[in-house]
Amino acid sequence: MAGVMARFFYGANKIVATALFLVLPAALPIAAQKSPSQSASHKTSTKDASGDSSKPKLVVILVVDQMRGDYIDKFQRQWTGGLKRLVDEGAWFHEAAYPYGATETCVGHSTISTGAFPASHGMIGNEWWDREQQKDVTCTADASVKNMAYEDGRAPAASGAVVGASSSTSKAAGDSAARMLIPAFAEELKFQSGAGTRVVAMSLKARAAITLAGHQADSVTWWDGGTGLWQTSSAYPQAPFIAEFVKLHPVTEDYGKTWASLLPESAYLYDKAAVNVGSPAGYGSTFPHPLRGATDGKGPDVSFYLQWATSPYAETYLTHMAEEAVEKLQLGSGAGIDFLSISFSSVDYVGHAFGPRSWEIQDELARLDRDLDEFFTHLDKTVGRGKYVVAFSSDHGVAPVPEDLHKTGVDAGRLNLEEVRSRIEQTLEPLHYAKPSVARIDGADVYFTRGTYTKLKSDPLALQAVIDAMQGTPGVARVYHAEELDDRPATRNPIRAAEAAGYFKTRSGDLLIVPKPYWIWDYSAPGKPARNGGTSHGTPHYYDQRVPVILMGTGIRRGKYYELATPADIAPTLATICGITLATQDGRTLHEALDGSQSTQGPSSTQAPSSAQARSRSEAHTPADR
């Protein structure tokens, strides 16, 4: 779901905060495009980390895809399990936010895993236009590897694909972390913390599991929504425990079940029926949601797989798979510091379909609260309470469904990118430019055909005419050209700074569109109804940028913190706790949340915000958390 949305007037609020985030990173050089294996920090240590009681035995990164930061404030009173434990026992950075505009899944997961921004790690979106190959590429696409499906007990005819623990899928290119240009925290942990460290990652999405694990891992597992099969690729070892688990527990066991509301009606904050254009995941607009696909009782199909992914059943399945990994691999019981990451994707699918102001999103989180309670209890019993550290965050937030806001009089809508393309072509045609002049528009990124942008740069009047035409499109707030963003320019404009932090010269567009707040991308033909309903993300607006950052466990001082923080701070902080060094980082170590065994800096408990920070937040929340 290549989503994106609105931007520009999120208030004087995060203007100061975003600029502060980018002051130091702006001085750092963009990582050279070299193999992460060349990192100077990749020196394997022979020291056994198991004897140091100040270090965790297991590092766990939990990512809830598309979890807005304000969901905790809105829904936590209904939580009694794992989410409640994170808030109560963890170090919660209340105002954490991404300081860049490319708030998408691949970008956020890469930032969490590396401690760097897109301008350093190179993952600028879920996909981008490859100028050399003249085609779209996904962020984890790798033609040198093959994806391998795990058999799950179904006959091949039922699954729609050749299955087996060592069989290749039909996809032309496989998936790996080859396009991520710097090492992940998990890789550095494996190289530096001592022999025996195991790295395990899992998610419904390949781009989530792979980027959290990095280039070298012991088990990386994701799900193919087209076949309903779990898979890995030849870039990683196949995991016998995964093969056994999915064979014993096929996803199709959930066929015919119904997702009904968990909470009493009085507990839900919003209207029962979500405002939506279209049919969300093949469901109706209100509970209950039966998981019966398009065949309605004739067996699992692709529609069922979409429904399953857009339901709490998928999160529960991943939780059980993670518990199996801990049990079978004895994670947290070896000679090194082990690593486990789980990215829960269903909140993202539910959010895209129903929006953040829906019963479904509230219910999904209430059920995840139960799953995480079970998971933490399992870790307490197998690894030991106090012997593991958890980092909890999200890859991005999300905008409200624009129609939901529009009916209240807010300027919100769907920015038609085909109209943007048409305006560019109409502007350049009489100036004798090649037709077509536009090769691809992917959300904010506009890519021109070969030679067109070079010609435009030498013709400033034509370039300005194109930008003016684009800015006349309903929903467009601003257009930047590449030269305004390259090399992270020093700027007091927080929007330009945010776009620059997400810009990577050889991958980003020639022009970048900044939508107005509460406007999201629409790829339908001009004048036609919106192709997709629901909502999306992918802009430098606060509702896209603000996400949870919570640390809990070994080395962490619990409390509620109001200091500036970003998910890029997670990897540096975990590195400090584990006693390793990252190759490249744009984030900082959150010293204020570390206990005395890890840091001599920082406060002892909850930190009240300064008056400037409090003023900044109040301004930001005025419309941005609608």
What name fits each language-model region?
Residues 210-219, 291-306, 310, 330-368, ...:
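Active-site His/acidic residue clusters
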Residues 191-192, 196-203, 209-212, 315-349, ...:
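Active-site regions of oxyanion-processing enzymes, predominantly non-cytosolic
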Residues 156-171, 211, 252-327, 331-332:
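Long, low-complexity, polar/charged, intrinsically disordered or flexibly structured peripheral segments
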Residues 69, 84-85, 182-191, 443-480, ...:
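Non-catalytic, well-ordered alpha-helical segments in soluble enzyme domains
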Residues 73-120, 198-202:
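Short, structured active-site-proximal loop/turn typified by the sulfatase FGly-forming signature C/S-X-P-X-R
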Residues 601, 606-615:
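Short Gly/Ser/Thr- and charged-rich N-terminal loops/segments
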Residues 34-92:
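Active-site-proximal N-terminal segment of extracellular/periplasmic enzymes that hydrolyze or transfer
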Residues 78, 95, 104, 126-174, ...:
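Secreted, luminal/periplasmic, and some membrane-associated catalytic domains
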